[in-house]
Swiss-Prot record:
GO cellular component, one term: cytoplasm
UniProt entry tagged with the keyword Protease: no
Reactions catalysed according to its record: cytidine(1402) in 16S rRNA + S-adenosyl-L-methionine = N(4)-methylcytidine(1402) in 16S rRNA + S-adenosyl-L-homocysteine + H(+)
Positions with a binding annotation for S-adenosyl-L-methionine: A35, G36, H37, D55, F84, D105, Q112
Name the record gives this protein: Ribosomal RNA small subunit methyltransferase H
Originating organism: Streptococcus suis (strain BM407)
GO biological process, one term: rRNA base methylation
Keywords per UniProt: Cytoplasm, Methyltransferase, rRNA processing, S-adenosyl-L-methionine, Transferase
């Protein structure tokens, strides 16, 4: 029996519609999650089309077996329980070397945040965990209690962009010298105590950026996204498209940079023609990110920081 898996899909129609679905095409949902994007994408396919859906969380896959049951019966969907950084390898094992489109919904899913024992949220008391793949070895407890001061400062600055990273790392170092820091509440209170009073009056939870930083470190989120998106670009067939939803500046910056590198070429100006092997493989479909509508923002608080970028394969 699976737990309730409530998840409101962000930018649902925009993400899938921008893939310009071919009814008999081969598609990938790199981040199955609540299966919202998968369900809508499958509704656009004929019996000749197929979807490969990745997720490293078994709970998400169990839920999707219920939500997508009618498509499973027709043999239109294949679930792959793995990190999407293994995209190319896992698809190759299934005989897939080219795809017509792929979508990503990066970051942690709402059900993972809401499931207290997963330890993702600073709003609920739970053991420090934060693993998207529950079989992974590194946990938030390991990071908080075993990383030295300099490594803590590094990840807090790099992944949390918190200007009080040094003070927070020092406070953690002092606290764990007395006893291990074991819960999300303990950590959140330590973070609050390291920040000046005027900072605590600002909008947003004072622990948000540090929790984000630890979560990214535990799951190597940016490294996995970097590897996977590059593989996806390579896998795309001509005119195939890639849609990526991001939820914070680090993810968006990474996606924007990868798309830029794949859609521009470094050749001298004035060349009479550009050889095929030097042509950029991608073309940006939207120069600026697509944002949620006002209606969606009012209906789904999680959508507030969402940005969608889309690109198309124009050269192999």
């Amino acid at each position: 029996m699976t737990k309730e898996f409530n998840h409101t899909t962000v930018l649902l129609h925009e993400t899938v519609d921008m893939l310009d679905i071919k009814p008999n095409g081969i598609y990938v949902d790199a981040t199955l999650g609540g299966a919202g994007h998968s369900e809508y994408l499958l509704s656009q396919l004929t019996d000749g089309g197929h979807l490969y859906a990745f997720d490293q969380d078994q709970t998400a896959i169990d839920h999707a077996h219920i939500r997508l049951a009618s498509y499973i019966e027709k043999g239109q969907v294949t679930f792959i329980r793995d990190n999407f950084r293994n995209l190319k390898t896992r698809l190759a094992e299934l005989g897939v070397t080219e795809i017509d489109g792929i979508c990503y919904d990066l970051g942690v899913s709402s059900p993972q945040l809401d499931e207290r024992e997963r330890g993702f949220s600073y709003k609920q008391d739970a053991p420090l965990d934060m693993r998207m793949n529950r079989e992974g070895h590194l946990t938030a407890y390991d990071v908080v209690n075993n990383y030295d001061y300099h490594d803590l400062v590094r990840i807090f600055f790099k992944y949390g962009e918190d200007k009080f990273s040094k003070q927070i790392a020092r406070k953690i170092e002092q606290a764990r010298a007395v006893k291990p820091i074991e819960t999300t509440t303990e950590l959140a209170e330590l973070i609050k105590s390291a920040k000046p009073a005027k900072e605590l009056k600002k909008k947003g939870h004072p622990a948000k950026q540090i929790f984000q930083a630890i979560r990214i470190e535990v799951n190597d989120e940016l490294g996995a996204a970097d590897e996977s998106i590059q593989q996806a670009i390579d896998l795309l067939a001509l005119d195939g498209r890639i849609s990526v939803i991001t939820f914070h500046s680090l993810e968006d910056r990474l996606t924007k940079q990868l798309f830029k590198e794949a859609s521009t070429i470094d050749v001298p100006k004035g060349l009479p023609f550009i050889p095929d092997d030097l042509k950029a493989p991608l073309e940006l479909v939207n120069r600026k990110p697509i944002l949620p509508s006002q209606e969606e923002l009012e209906a789904n608080n999680r959508a507030h920081s969402a940005k969608l970028r889309v690109a198309k394969k124009v050269h192999k």
